[in-house]
A protein has these predicted regions:
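Hydrolase active-site cap/lid region
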Residues: 190-241
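N-terminal cap/lid segment of alpha/beta-hydrolase-fold proteins
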Residues: 54-96
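Alpha/beta-hydrolase active-site loop
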Residues: 148-169
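C-terminal catalytic histidine-bearing segment of alpha/beta-hydrolase fold enzymes
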Residues: 277, 286-340
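N-terminal targeting or regulatory segments adjacent to alpha/beta-hydrolase or S9 domains
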Residues: 1-67
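Conserved alpha/beta-hydrolase
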Residues: 120-142
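Short beta-strand/loop motif that positions the catalytic acidic residue
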Residues: 255-256, 261-264, 268
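Conserved alpha/beta-hydrolase "acid-adjacent" motif
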Residues: 269-275
Length: 340
């Protein structure tokens, strides 16, 4: 009996050590799975402004976008000397006095995706100048570890694009709009919080809280939601960053006299529409008299592979194309004053 009592504390310590190691390495697996940046751009790498087709899982949806194709663009590189990063971008310039709009794609996507090419094309046809960039770890931009940071580092890429338009092209801050999709919307929202001169922003399917996203993804794949705590710890230990530390709600709360449009799908399974509503509610509470907030819940889903694969995430520009185009024209036309 005394022998059992003597070894009991050691067994407890061993159990706790094994449990802690399991917790950390399970968290590491979840963190790296959640933060991993797939390099396939959802099968859209062959797209170019002069010819692009909408694809999900590499399968075309059947939507004819040929009326929106555009030429006369060029590729540039934005150099971030502090981080030694190269950010690839396409620009298409309108008339000398035309306002600019910066377009930022989502997770695992790139500037070749219809989710940014189509709305950019809509604005090109209205006379705007546009920039479409690849976030770090995506597309033709610099790769470090193929992990995203939920917008916390990616917002620097957004700010680099915005400042290039402002400083290199000499465009007044009030003539520059920004458009972000999903992860890109989160990065844009954080950039909106950092740069008070950024005046007009459109967010498509933004997330409001990264911890909620990780928890919902765990549940979607059959894992207990409490494992998100292990993922948070692993991000700090192995990635050197807490991807849940900052929230795009910071951007919504910093709106003041600026302008924000939030579009979110009612049937979005990846970023549930409650996130868009949280962003909308926060912005409305922080709005000042000269600012504006518009919130729109879109309908519909996209099915490919004979209905075997379906998504409601970032599909509004396809399912409600005419309305999407008109609302973009109205929002940016009012906030950037296209016509002098």
């Amino acid at each position: 009996m005394r022998s059992v009592n003597r070894w009991f504390p050691l067994w407890v310590i061993a159990f706790l050590l094994i449990f802690a190691a399991g917790w950390v390495f399970t968290g590491k697996y979840i963190y790296e799975s959640a933060a991993y940046v797939d390099q396939g751009c959802w099968g859209n790498l062959s797209n170019r402004p002069e010819e692009f087709h909408p694809r999900y899982w590499g399968i075309e949806t059947g939507h004819d976008l040929s009326a929106w194709w555009f030429k006369d663009y060029r590729e540039i590189e934005l150099i971030q000397e502090k981080e030694n990063l190269r950010i690839s971008a396409w620009i298409r310039e309108g008339e000398t006095r035309a306002p600019w709009i910066l377009f930022v794609h989502g997770l695992g996507s790139c500037k070749n995706s219809h989710t940014v090419l189509l709305p950019a094309a809509m604005m090109v046809h209205e006379g705007y100048s546009v920039m479409l960039l690849d976030l770090r770890e995506h597309g033709a931009s610099s790769k470090i570890d193929l992990l995203h940071t939920a917008g916390q580092e990616e917002m620097q890429d957004v700010l680099s694009g915005w400042r290039w338009i402002h400083e290199v092209k000499g465009i007044a801050a009030e003539k520059i709009g920004v458009y972000g999709v999903s992860l890109g919307a989160g990065a844009v929202a954080l950039a909106f919080a950092e740069e008070p001169r950024m005046g007009a922003v459109w967010l498509d399917s933004p997330f409001a809280d990264m911890e909620k996203i990780v928890r919902s993804e765990l549940l979607r794949f059959g894992y207990p939601a409490f494992l998100s705590g292990g993922a948070k710890m692993a991000g700090q230990l192995f990635g050197g960053i807490d991807i849940m530390e900052r929230s795009p709600l910071e951007g919504a709360g910093a709106i003041g006299n600026r302008h924000l449009f939030i579009a979110h799908g009612k049937q979005d399974e990846r970023v549930p529409p409650v996130h868009g509503q949280m962003m909308c509610d926060t912005a409305k509470k922080s709005l000042k008299p000269q600012g504006s907030v518009e919130c729109w819940q879109t309908r519909g889903k996209i099915s490919v592979d004979e209905g075997r694969k379906t998504t409601g995430h970032t599909v509004g520009m396809l399912t409600e194309m005419e309305d999407w185009n008109q609302r973009m024209k109205d929002f940016f036309g009012r906030t950037l004053q296209l016509k002098p």
